[in-house]
A protein has these predicted regions:
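Short, polar/charged alpha-helical segment
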Residues: 1-16, 135-141
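A short helix->loop->beta-strand "cap" motif at the edges of active sites that frequently abuts
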Residues: 69-73, 145, 195-198, 219
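Extracellular/periplasmic Venus flytrap/periplasmic-binding protein
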Residues: 33-36, 82-85, 91-194
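Extracellular/periplasmic periplasmic-binding protein-like sensory domains
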Residues: 190-221
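Short, well-ordered alpha-helical microsegments
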Residues: 58-60, 104, 183-184, 207-211
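Short glycine-enriched loops at secondary-structure junctions
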Residues: 28, 78-82, 125-128, 205-207
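Periplasmic-binding protein-like
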Residues: 41-55, 73-77, 118-123, 171-180, ...
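Beta-alpha junction/loop-to-helix N-cap segments that form part of ligand/metal-binding clefts
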Residues: 10-84, 96, 154-158
């Protein structure tokens, strides 16, 4: 958002001879809230272009809403869910960024190169992590890797004890696709429980929150 505001400011608020006004709205990563925010921007504020959202589930919801507003151009923000553009696409919803599966290319081979022949998945239960896990497994399983267990956890989870208790002894590593505070909470609880499995991280796992985490488990990601 700050980048867009800076770009408009540097051009004196005018692009191609047109005065540009930026109107902001928040969604808190909830698809219903995102659609309500989009509805206000489009139907009340009369925006010509809507850019956003960030989260995968939000992106799918906004894509579906865009079909009811053909006069408005929708540009995907950071939402990396494949279904925003690959499933029932909308003619006025455009993606210029990569999606979750693409960001995981190469991680499956890296896991096999490290000798991780069996990997458990721990990921948040919504669209973007689904894409991340799919991207990892497509390559990893093709190379002979096995995923004996996938644990899908709620976004914003606080207690990972039941997931930690289910980690099989015979897996070589964990694929962790948790973002921000969720990742830090899991790493803290796993380390406190004596967990010692090496970890692979999704693109949302290595955020600044996780990089600032001081525990030993961070260093194994």
């Amino acid at each position: 958002m700050r980048g867009a505001e800076l770009a408009v400011k540097q051009r004196g608020g005018v692009v191609a001879g047109r005065q540009i006004q930026i109107i902001k709205a928040s969604s808190n990563a909830n698809p219903d809230v995102a659609v309500n925010a989009a509805r206000k921007l489009v139907e009340q504020d009369k925006v010509d272009i809507l850019v956003g959202p960030l989260s995968g589930g939000e992106g799918i919801a906004i894509k579906d809403y865009s079909k009811t507003q053909p006069q408005t151009t929708f540009i995907n923000g950071g939402s990396g869910a494949q279904a925003t553009t690959l499933v029932n696409p909308s003619p006025n919803f455009f993606r210029f960024n990569t999606e979750g599966a693409q960001w995981m290319v190469g991680l499956g081979k890296a896991a096999m190169d490290k000798g991780y022949k069996r990997v458990m998945v721990i990921a948040e239960d919504y669209a973007f992590p689904y894409s991340q896990v799919q991207g990892f497994m497509a390559e990893y399983c093709r190379l002979g890797g096995k995923v004996p267990l996938k644990a899908w956890v709620p976004l914003g989870g606080k207690d990972y004890s039941s997931v930690i208790a289910r980690i099989p002894r015979d897996v070589d590593a964990l694929l962790v696709v948790l973002g921000g505070a969720d990742a830090v909470n899991f790493l803290t609880q796993y380390e406190n429980a004596g967990g010692d499995k090496p970890m692979l991280g999704g693109s949302i796992t290595v955020s600044q929150d996780v990089l600032n985490y001081r525990g030993k488990r961070r260093d194994s990601l």
